[in-house]
Amino acid sequence: MSRAPRTARAELPKGAQARHVPVLLAEVLAALSLDRPGLAVDGTFGAGGYTRALLEAGPEVRVIAIDRDPTAIRGGADLVTASGGRLRLVQGRFGDLDTLIADQDEPQADWVVLDIGVSSMQIDEAQRGFSFRQDGPLDMRMGGEGPSAADLVNGEEETTLADILYHFGEERRSRAVARAIVEARRRAPIETTAQLADLVAGVVRPEPGSPIHPATRSFQGLRIAVNDELGELVRGLHAAERVLKPGGRLAVVTFHSLEDRIVKQFFSARSGRAAQASRHVPGVERPAPKSFKLVTKGPVLPSEAETDVNPRSRSAKLRAGERTDAPAPPPLSAIETLASLPAPQGRGPRR
């Protein structure tokens, strides 16, 4: 994908927010094409990297930034002050972004950006319980509400744990890990990230020469389940579709194959490349109005230079689309299915 020229930048004081350079930033800005006054919605504020770039793209770009994490909202206070009234921070889930911006008297938006998954800020804070590289409480909740990872690990049935690890974490040894978890918790509750990481490492052997920690996939699966991340992504795509004006653009950055599959199927169906099935008429595929046209013809990947500087970007993919004037069709049942645990179907190829 060719990179669009940068628009005039409205510089913000460097002290307004700790600098955080998000993944594929130049490519996201090019895909959005912020070439006019309007409202941008950053559905995943985090450390504020995309929001800062949106504000700097032009002096007449206004931003509503959303995050379910109250810590992120508090951390953005200086950036709000520096924005001169152009930034509003809203605590909530991006799956409700249409309702959240309507509550701000903004029924429509010109641009929406979603950066899916856990933020670097959350990973780096041991007390949040996301990282297997730092010991902390086994939490993983982005917003602090609902059951924690410790609740799942110590309370779910073995078969459910195995399904979570396999389908959300893509862990091939999911049954063995789930069995080890159940055996360990009979002796004592599993309460810290180090306990769980060590337990998984005793079951999943690292591949020779691989930099991937043996607990990576298990932690991913639990985190996705705790935060309903795939369900939130599905709701966010449909919410963005409802709020975008004709000509408005949606850019989505994903970090693993499950997320990317959902985004790919959404844009494929909504652009007319695939038939659409609705939950309201299950099993029936039919032509539907094309609510998006593709901006990116395939996934945009980070450059080698970016992955050298930021190894966490290596799995990132960007997809983007431009809203047409067609009304938003009913939600897609196909991507709703991808976001859920499938019904049990025998033992399959996992161990």
Swiss-Prot record:
Q: What is its EC number?
A: 2.1.1.199
Catalysis: reaction(s): cytidine(1402) in 16S rRNA + S-adenosyl-L-methionine = N(4)-methylcytidine(1402) in 16S rRNA + S-adenosyl-L-homocysteine + H(+)
Q: Using the UniProt annotation, give all residue ranges assigned to the region (Disordered).
A: 274-351
Would the keyword Cytoplasm turn up in this protein's UniProt record? yes
Question: According to its UniProt record, which protein family does this protein belong to?
Answer: Belongs to the methyltransferase superfamily. RsmH family.
Role, per record: Specifically methylates the N4 position of cytidine in position 1402 (C1402) of 16S rRNA.
Its recorded name reads Ribosomal RNA small subunit methyltransferase H
Query: What species is this protein from?
Result: Methylorubrum extorquens (strain PA1) (Methylobacterium extorquens)
* Protein encoded by which gene: rsmH
